[in-house]
Amino acid sequence: MKITAFPLFAAIALAPTLAAQSNPAPPQDSATFDPDGTAHIMRTVPMPTTISPEAQNWLASLTQQKGGQQTLAERRARTDEWRKFGSGEARKYYPANVEETTTAGVRTDIITPLTMPEANRNRVLINLHGGGFNSDSGSLIEGIPIANLAKTKVVSVYYRLAPENPFPAAVDDVVAVYKELLKTHKPGSIGIFGTSAGAILTAEVAVRLKQSGLPLPAALGIFSGLGDFSRVGDSRQLFTLNGFPGEMRPIDSKNLPDDQYVGKTDRKDPALSPLFADLHGMPPSLLVTSTRDILLSDTATLHRALLQAGVDARLVVFEALPHAFWYHFQLPETKEALEQMAKFFDEKVGR
């Protein structure tokens, strides 16, 4: 079985800082259009001056990465290697303690800050990692910084993965962990967050909890996600996971992505695609994306749906950076993004 080297919602591997190779510019900027409105675009996009020098160097380094084809086993091996490296980096920047355990029969990591105010001891955040639903790209990479900055315990959930376990297996696992935590925590003292696949799961879990009549958590963190598996947002036709660099493959209604996760579920099922669910009464939500994020459009569309349902939903869009850039701790923009995430939970959870 072959899949793309960087499937949708996978983490971006950290690359060394390299000078971008000089290539000849296209003869001229142009755009032509088919009768149905399909655009064929050639553009010259200079390195943005509106981001930090560190981010400029990082964007340049992404042009040196090579894609290609990988088997699922190869992808998981590569992602595991990245996760180990990224977790070590996370601890350097944001020290925290990590304990491996199980919760409701599901493997979890308990991440605790080195110091925790007494007022925060009743709070807990559930982290749902990214990785394209078929691997773990960021369990500790996501959970460690938030535990450190929010001075709050984080439970990172190793939910079952596709293709072996398609939807709704991952949702079932997270709900089981949430119900277990309800035995020791009030729902108002629990928050749920995730990046990419984990962001999608966060919204799906909230819908499941509402449909099941369970108490909802205090807050949701949806960091580069989507709410609709039946359609493709505009940014997915413009960007790869690295922004501009990388292989682009056209997506249309006949070859929608993520079949292995979706399985036999109707793509418009509200439990799978929260955009079709009743979102009234959903918890306060923070959504974070960036202007070269492959899921920029999908994140913005979900944000609008939450607003239309009267939800306290905030959208933060960072300039010129690609998908899940906050996995890369050398960037000042990452520090800002993580601090905003932690501040949001500090305001909403257990208060």
PLM regions and their residue ranges:
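Positively charged n-region of N-terminal signal peptides that target proteins for export
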Residues: 1-5
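Bacterial N-terminal signal peptides
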Residues: 7-17
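Alpha/beta-hydrolase superfamily serine-hydrolase fold, recognizing
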Residues: 22-36, 42-70, 92-351
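Phosphate-/polyanion-interacting regions in eukaryotic proteins
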Residues: 64-85
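An N-cap/entry alpha-helix motif that binds or orients negatively charged groups
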Residues: 80-98
